[in-house]
């Protein structure tokens, strides 16, 4: 995947207590911090933080809106180039989830004083190459010293004001499609104890570095009512936000959810990031599980790094969208997408998993 070498004198992965989006502040803690803040009234601010969406959107004119997002996190790999690629793909993903196209990016970089210069360059090169692949431009950034490495980007993109995809606009009857497997947090946690199969870990890195651009370019041709990308709040955390924001309930078929190999075994052994528990607490009693093994429950709360798009598509377009996505993705590291559930009329519980 890269021509860089892992530095034997500086272990990039072990420098991170919580790799990737596992370091993200929990959704519950974030809600508590922001609840007393109000967004300044501006008619051109089309999407703010009130619905916990993927990015902010500001209307420039009748044909153009600016999408603005930011993401950075600790290392997910001992290979600096792979870390740079995954961090960049994760940062770009919010633009795609909103239905937009990325254009400009700024590096956000925390380095330690003992990091080798070649390693720093490789992280930046990984990020630069991935942004270039996306058709966008890295045009600057900001770098500081810190106790542990962190990298990501602030990204700006554009979308037509009437074609914005939000996470809080799902409709009753929508079909839910997921474009990447879940389990990155558990897989990365197990890898720190050398308990993840090397071939599956390599596949995970390739999938995390895979842009959601292809899925975005296909889905915008169909009637999509809502979309988000699966990251730090886990599959069920993001589904909960979608259901709550949309005033709907959501039914999930857990056996249809695509997963990485070995993650169930790791979950059964308790090899999970702390985010699994904070995400479960965030959803609270707004969910009911029907005959779902505990390990699968934990897996669906697992914080994801550079996860797939969760697409809420009108039922009339679902079959055609699924077919086109399948043809486009089945020969990529991601493999075929999966239909994982349905949006239903709001009932007592927001989420029902069976």
Swiss-Prot record:
GO terms for molecular function: ATP binding; magnesium ion binding; selenide, water dikinase activity. The active site is at residue 21. Mg(2+) binds at residues 54, 94, 229. GO terms for biological process: selenocysteine biosynthetic process. Its EC number is 2.7.9.3. Disulfide bonds: none annotated. The record marks 24 as: Important for catalytic activity. Binds 1 Mg(2+) ion per monomer. Its cofactor is Mg(2+). ATP binds at residues 24, 51-53, 71, 94, 141-143. It is an enzyme of class 2 (transferase). Signal peptide: none annotated. CDD domains: SelD. Keywords: ATP-binding, Kinase, Magnesium, Metal-binding, Nucleotide-binding, Selenium, Selenocysteine, Transferase. It catalyses: hydrogenselenide + ATP + H2O = selenophosphate + AMP + phosphate + 2 H(+). GO terms for cellular component: cytoplasm. InterPro entries: PurM-like_C_dom, PurM-like_C_sf, PurM-like_N, PurM-like_N_sf, SelD_I, SPS/SelD. Synthesizes selenophosphate from selenide and ATP. Belongs to the selenophosphate synthase 1 family. Class I subfamily. Homodimer. This is Selenide, water dikinase. It comes from Treponema denticola (strain ATCC 35405 / DSM 14222 / CIP 103919 / JCM 8153 / KCTC 15104). The gene is selD.
């Amino acid at each position: 995947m890269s021509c860089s070498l892992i530095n034997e004198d500086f272990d990039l992965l072990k420098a991170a207590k919580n790799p990737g989006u596992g370091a993200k502040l929990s959704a519950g803690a974030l809600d508590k911090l922001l609840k007393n803040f109000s967004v300044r009234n501006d008619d051109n601010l089309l999407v703010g933080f009130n619905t916990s969406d993927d990015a902010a959107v500001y209307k420039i004119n009748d044909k153009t809106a600016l999408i603005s997002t930011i993401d950075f996190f600790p290392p997910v790999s001992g290979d600096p180039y792979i870390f740079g690629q995954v961090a960049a793909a994760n940062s770009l993903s919010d633009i795609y989830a909103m239905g937009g196209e990325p254009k400009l990016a700024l590096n956000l970089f925390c380095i330690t004083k003992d990091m080798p210069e070649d390693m720093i360059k490789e992280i930046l090169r990984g990020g630069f190459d991935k942004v270039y692949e996306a058709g966008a431009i890295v045009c600057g950034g900001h770098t500081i010293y810190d106790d542990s490495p962190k990298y990501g980007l602030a990204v700006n993109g554009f979308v037509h004001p009437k074609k914005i995809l939000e996470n809080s606009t799902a409709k009753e009857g929508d079909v839910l499609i997921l474009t990447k497997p879940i389990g990155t947090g558990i897989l990365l946690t197990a890898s720190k104890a050398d308990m993840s199969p090397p071939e599956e870990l390599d596949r995970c890195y390739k999938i995390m570095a895979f842009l959601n651009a292809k899925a975005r370019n296909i889905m915008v041709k169909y009637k999509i009512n809502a979309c988000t990308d699966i990251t730090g709040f886990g599959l069920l955390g993001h589904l909960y936000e979608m259901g709550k924001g949309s005033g709907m309930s959501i039914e999930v078929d857990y056996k249809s959810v695509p997963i990485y190999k070995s993650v169930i075994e790791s979950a059964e052994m308790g090899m999970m990031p702390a985010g699994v528990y904070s995400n479960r607490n965030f959803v609270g009693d707004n969910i009911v599980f029907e005959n779902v093994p505990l390990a699968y429950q934990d897996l669906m709360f697992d914080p994801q790094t550079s996860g797939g798009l969760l697409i809420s598509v009108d039922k009339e377009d679902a079959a055609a969208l699924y077919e086109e996505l399948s043809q486009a993705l089945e020969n990529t590291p991601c493999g075929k997408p999966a239909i994982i559930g349905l949006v239903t009329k709001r009932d007592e519980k927001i989420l029902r998993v069976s």
